[in-house]
Amino acid sequence: MAKLERLNREEFARRRRQLMRIMGKGTIAIVPAAPVRHRNSDVEYPYRQDSDFQYLTGFGEPESVAVLIPGREPAEYVLFVRDRDPLRETWDGRRAGPEGAVAQFGADDAFPISDIDEILPGLLENREKVYYAMGSHPEFDQRVVAWLQGLRTQARNGRHAPLEMVALDHVLHDMRLYKSRAELQLMRTAGQIAADAHVRAMRHCRPGGHEYGIVAELLHEFRRHNADTSYQPIVGGGANSCILHYRENDMPLVDGDLLLVDAGCEYSFYASDITRTYPVNGTFTPAQREVYDIVLAAQLAAIAQVRPGNHWNAPHDAAVEVITRGLLGLGLLKGKLPQLIKDGAYRRFFMHRTGHWLGMDVHDVGDYKVGDEWRVLEPGMVMTVEPGIYIPAGSKGVPKRYANIGIRIEDDVVVTRTGCEVLTDGVPKTADEIEALMAAAAAA
């Protein structure tokens, strides 16, 4: 992989301009950076910038606040950042400082974060509306409330606080739902890295290994391309494949079991999310293949519904119909297809939705409904498509040959002008393709 791809300054500037057009004059938006979080004692978690802050600024440091003031001269975009500090930079890394915030990150003006209590109330003064995501940063919420209350006490002096607080996250998250060309290119890269990692994991899967060994293969591929995990990988063999959010990843890989691997990477702040399920020994049993082919057919039917003009729930409806019909064919459900779908009988074995939005967050922002109606799919929206069937041992009325079969197949799909594009098609998906890849790896 070449040098880490990044969005250019103009991409961030375009987003800020778009947001300020939506806000209108006489308004102000306040967006804080993510706080540093402690793992234990004096050990910190690796710092990851707040997605909304990153989306608007591209500025990766903590203890920062972005302020947007449409129409303000001479500075519409103001950053509050940490001052340069040679001693702290020796310990913790370089800082941009106020000068760097302007020169490198496109701020119109920048101030030390230590001065925010003196400066920001003046920026709030006499604005009609303040756009802020109340509740997203509880500690910072208290400071915003204090600034507003302080202004209200000075109303007799002609200093007026904004009359209305508008939920910034609602506006900003609708913007984030539509990916630009530059964003989609990063998501293609994230998808390709994750696809390569899944192929590597398949090739290293053997009876006698362990789930954590598969995790290691995934992480190896992520890190060698300067990517990280977009969420904790789920690597569950046998009975663990039937646990949707299995976390331990520490059990042996057993001959005859299936292995469900749900793992994606984050590359330059954009996530991928892939799931594949395959036999530990490289060969599906007849029962495993029966169930696998139903899930694959459901996923392909769902992907076929990802196109402009269809509503968000269309892929799920398609997957539900295929899975319910398949469960009827296996004898795991009994009754008439329409009634079983209406009653949700399939939820015994397929209990989750078929997908979610994908972007800077793996479960990305954006409403699924507009009012009471499912949202209509439009070009630039990115979603996962991930139906599954899970049959834990001891399920009442289920033949033993299906016990502990947990299968999910997941890809990342972008809505295009004419249909859709699968961003993660670099991983084998049919049972025959999977067996061929694993056989070749075993023979190598």
Language-model segment annotations:
Residues 1-444:
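Active-site neighborhoods and metal-handling regions in enzymes and metal-associated proteins
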